[in-house]
Structures are given as C-alpha cells and as structure tokens.
C-alpha cells in the first residue's frame, strides 16, 4: 500500500511558506488538499456576507493555484469529527498534516482529530506557520504565564531563537511524482460553493473592495514593500482622509486567513530595511502590527474565556449597561454623530475600517459615551470585519475599553473633533453618508448645530432625515470617566504610578475631549457637541509597567484600596508582570 496523504486547510490558505503541507508531500504517493465546510455553521455563525465572500474567494484562488500543479482543492461539507473517520477509510489515508492553531477552540478540535487519526493508524504532522513564534515557548520563558504588557512581550521575544525563514513555495518540482486522485464529478462533489448555496441573498451586494486569495495577497505585499521611503525612515503614515479608505497595499485580511505568511512579510520587511539602511539591524517597531498580533495570540492561547468578561482572569469586571436599542443604533450607524455613523457604514459595506477609526467607535460604545460592554462591540466586529480574528478582536476590545492591557481610562475620542481634525472637509462623511452631502464643512461633523436654513439647503433636516445625537457627548463622557475611575479605585491589587491620583477631578473639564496622541492639539468638544480649535489634550504617559494586577472574579470581590503608588523597580517590571490570580473554573 502506498503513502496517501491529506492536508487539511483551515487558515493558512496558501502554497507559499506552508511547512505542514510541504512535509506532508515529502515521501507521499498521493496528496489531497481538503477544506471542511460545515453548512450548518454557515447558516448560524456570527459571520457576515463580506467575510464569507472573502473566504470563498480565498478557496477559489487556492483551487486555481493547485490546478496549476495538476491538483485540486476538495471542499467537503460536514463536521471534521464526522468527516475524517470516513476519509481515512475511503482514501486509505496514512498521513494527515495541519497548521498549528493556537486558539483554545482550535486546540480542542485538533486534539480530537489527532485522537481519531491515531486510532486509525494515521500519522499526524503539525507545524507552526500562522504565527512568527512558538507561543508556548514565550509563555514558558515568562514562568508559565502569558505576558500581559507589550513591553514585557518585547523583552521575551528578544531572548528567543532567531525566526525560521519561510519554507519554499509548493511547486511542481516540490510535488514531483506525488499525484492527486480526481474524479470526473469533482466540481459537483468538492467544488467551492457560492454565497447563494450557503443561503446568502446577494441582491444589492456591491463588488468586493478586498478580493480574497493568495494571489492578491502577494501582489499587495509587493505594493506594500514599494513604499521604500516609509521603510527607510520608518515613519508611521500621517492620518488623513485618504487613510480612512481601503488601500491597495492593505494586508490585514490576508494575514488573518493566512493567504499571506506573516513570516514572509517579516523577512521581506527585514531584507528591505537592511538594503535601505545598509545592513543595520531593524528596530522591533518596524514590525508593529505583526508583533501586536503575536502579543494577543500569546495572551489568548491558554484562556478559553478570553472573549468573555465573566470568568476571564485578565479582564476587569465592569458593570456595563445593557441597552439593546443604543447598541443597535451604534451597530447600524444611527447614532446621530456623522463621524461614528460613517465609520460603521463603511464597516458594514466593505468589511474594513482604519485602526484609528476602530478605536473611535470602540471608545464611543464603551467607556466614553454609551457604557455598553466591549463583548457586544466585539460581536459586531466579528460579524462585519474581514480581518476579525478571535484573539486579536477580543484583545483589542478589552484594551480599548480599559478592561485589560491598558487602563488610561481618562482618554476618549471626541466623536466630532477627532474626525474634523482628520478630514476637515468632511469628504469621508459625504462618501458614506450621502444624506449629509449638502452640508458645508463647518457643520458636517455636527449638523445639529447648523441653522435651519442651512439644513433646508442641504435637504437634510436633523431629527427628520438624519437622527439627532443620541447622547450629549460632553456629559456622557464626564460621567463615564468618573464611573471608570471609581471602579479602578476599588481594585484591590492595582500597582501603578499613582495613576488614579493624577486623574483630574473633572477630567472632562475641557468639554469632553480626551487625547490619544501625546503632544498634539486637537479640536475641543463643547458641551453642545460643537468643536473649537486649540485646546490642549490630557495625556498621562505611564509606561507599560502599569498593567493592572487583576482581581478576583466579579465586582463583589473588588477590594480594599490602592497600592503605594511607587514605580515598580526594573526587576519587578520584567519579572512580575501579569495577573496573580488563579484561573476560575468555567463550569
């Protein structure tokens, strides 16, 4: 009997830098590449049509690239635990390869499949390629706990072995004599389904702004690297109106689905930097979003409650309000704040928004204006974002709601001033909220302040054609910052730089604007919500070592006062980061 191999695609939807697939092919007589699609999951999961379309395009592109190698992708309907025992027998499988999945659900699923494979006498190959590092080694290096500050994470990875370079792309030379048995009815049995087959109504669906697939990902990577000046000077692009629109060099959805290898991206950046900088070593900051991605993956890998507040040992237990009506207005872009509504409209239409736009709407939903749980916002992003990733999505929402990783709760974005500073003319608003197109720039961010005559000329009456603001931002943010301050004052084991003592008694005294970037002057929101230029921002730079040492489960456990406010020593900073609590049972 020959060696019959199966590679199971989940993420990692690519032929470049795919070590599990490459090893599976070696020594095999036949290779079948499968993707398992659960039809029930397609109809019931919290995933919107844009992300499903992106996934199906990824699968179509993967199938097209496999065809060039005289192979095909086999899309199989069912659940893995039901599908594999049948395939092992039907195809006489002797070898199965998978990319390592670091998320708790994925680890549990893969453990079950490995058990079934072992019982069937099938060898299982598991290789890491969705992350840069072996996350378990990072945790081991940190004494068995995930690092909960980015500074500590950077310290740990600086001690790791150098990254392995990407493996060679799967080509006809790599496959050699390894063949894929194909049937005449392949497309009927194993073809990539359409959105309609999955039950989606595609009437009115606009063309994809982000085409899925490895081919597109590699094209975008080359465009991204053409920005040699950015790499040479390592300047973060300045935020402007064009930044808010989808870029032909954007990569985040491709990294999320594994159409693009994070290692390939890392080494391409490194090589280009060394060419431009004449072989000098690149700073860690060059890899920005790649390392934040690793940070959140590491924090989440052993925490199945990472996407929940309750039972999550690293999450502050905040008594958020339940307000389904307000949540719906936020999610559907009906808040009455054009900046917020334009962002949520772009998200729903295209499946992507700029990272600072994500910050703005997350702040508005949680600690700044609506006081609604980050879990609710996370679910909306999970549905609508192309690049929604369990670990990163949950981690980002905990961070932006000051529930973990970051506790500078007296920062919030003005839903008028931040947009006006970014795009003074309001072109972004006009693009996604055409109902407001007729307003002059002076009023487009706060149209409720426009005189009635201007509203009539714009053919948009506030409260009739476009909603009035759902909250008074200045008042809501002042009250919510005070609520957050009181919660943090109750945390029994907070260790920082006397952070709470430095919060002004009226942190919103400048009218509702809390700054995000130190050293800038940005528009000030008045109590009416209008903006005026020139107010300074409040910014307290407390360094990474203030990660709160989070507490027992539930608000009832909040304890007995603050720390002494002294800065931790450098030794404490590097050795004592992370929660000192036992994980609660999830039963």
Curated annotation (Swiss-Prot):
Sequence motif LIR 8, location on chain: 379-384
Residues modified to Phosphoserine: 71, 247, 280, 569
GO molecular function: DNA binding; FAD binding; photoreceptor activity
Span of the annotated motif LIR 3: 151-156
Chain positions of motif LIR 13: 492-497
Residue numbers covered by motif LIR 11: 430-435
Region ranges (Interaction with TIMELESS): 471-493
Record GO biological process: circadian regulation of gene expression; circadian rhythm; entrainment of circadian clock by photoperiod; gluconeogenesis; glucose homeostasis; negative regulation of circadian rhythm; negative regulation of DNA-templated transcription; negative regulation of G protein-coupled receptor signaling pathway
Cellular-component GO terms for this entry: cytoplasm; nucleus
Disulphide bridges: none
Region (Disordered): 554-587
Short motif LIR 9, span: 395-400
InterPro entries in UniProt: Crypto/Photolyase_FAD-like_sf (IPR036134), Crypto/Photolyase_N_sf (IPR036155), Cryptochr/Photolyase_FAD-bd (IPR005101), Cryptochrome/DNA_photolyase_1 (IPR002081), DNA_photolyase_N (IPR006050), Rossmann-like_a/b/a_fold (IPR014729)
Extent of motif LIR 10: 411-416
Motif (LIR 6): 285-290
Crosslinked positions (Glycyl lysine isopeptide (Lys-Gly) (interchain with G-Cter in ubiquitin)): 11, 107, 159, 329, 485
Family that this chain belongs to: Belongs to the DNA photolyase class-1 family.
Domain notes from UniProt: The LIR motifs (LC3-interacting region) 3 and 5 are required for its interaction with MAP1LC3B and for its autophagy-mediated degradation.
Known role: Transcriptional repressor which forms a core component of the circadian clock. The circadian clock, an internal time-keeping system, regulates various physiological processes through the generation of approximately 24 hour circadian rhythms in gene expression, which are translated into rhythms in metabolism and behavior. It is derived from the Latin roots 'circa' (about) and 'diem' (day) and acts as an important regulator of a wide array of physiological functions including metabolism, sleep, body temperature, blood pressure, endocrine, immune, cardiovascular, and renal function.
Protein name: Cryptochrome-1
Originating gene: CRY1
